[in-house]
């Protein structure tokens, strides 16, 4: 029997890069779906945060709602817009699974992902500052902590930050993955 030698040429290397890019594209799709769920959960959790104190009177109503604070409104809007963007970018991510060598659409996703990351970061940072003040107050300005009275509201608003900051980390990974796939093209 003769020994047959097989050379690894350009054809086998191209298939390997194509397979790696397809794997990156599948991971990109999964990360987009998880980030979408995180931003949706954050927007819903903050948007439904509401608590009234039990000793409210007919004249004075002690109630905490997300829409009383502009930073929380911005948080809900930024998470909602990012969630819609992620939903609209899923078909492009599926397209990248089918055609893993697509370049222009990857560049578009990198730019749009970066814009949405900045938007999401600004909303989450504004809300995080208010949640910090709600928990700790600021003694030099005589702002007192309200979380001893509004425990449910504070827990819900702080919990909504977790999904948003998680989605921010996933958006950073999405940008890195798209850049890697683009460089391997």
UniProtKB/Swiss-Prot annotation:
UniProt membrane topology term: Multi-pass membrane protein
Keywords from the UniProt entry: Cell membrane, Cell wall biogenesis/degradation, Glycoprotein, Membrane, Transmembrane, Transmembrane helix
InterPro entries: CASP/CASPL (IPR006459), CASP_dom (IPR006702), CASPL (IPR044173)
Cytoplasmic side: 1-25, 95-106, 182-185
Residues carrying a glycan: 138
Transmembrane segments: 26-46, 74-94, 107-127, 161-181
Side of membrane Extracellular, spans: 47-73, 128-160
The organism's place on the tree of life at top rank: Eukaryota
GO cellular component entries: plasma membrane
Main location: membrane
Location(s) in or outside the cell: Cell membrane
Any one of the GO BP annotations: cell wall organization
Family that this chain belongs to: Belongs to the Casparian strip membrane proteins (CASP) family.
Function in brief: Regulates membrane-cell wall junctions and localized cell wall deposition. Required for establishment of the Casparian strip membrane domain (CSD) and the subsequent formation of Casparian strips, a cell wall modification of the root endodermis that determines an apoplastic barrier between the intraorganismal apoplasm and the extraorganismal apoplasm and prevents lateral diffusion.
Assembly behavior: Homodimer and heterodimers.
Name used for this protein in its record: Casparian strip membrane protein 2
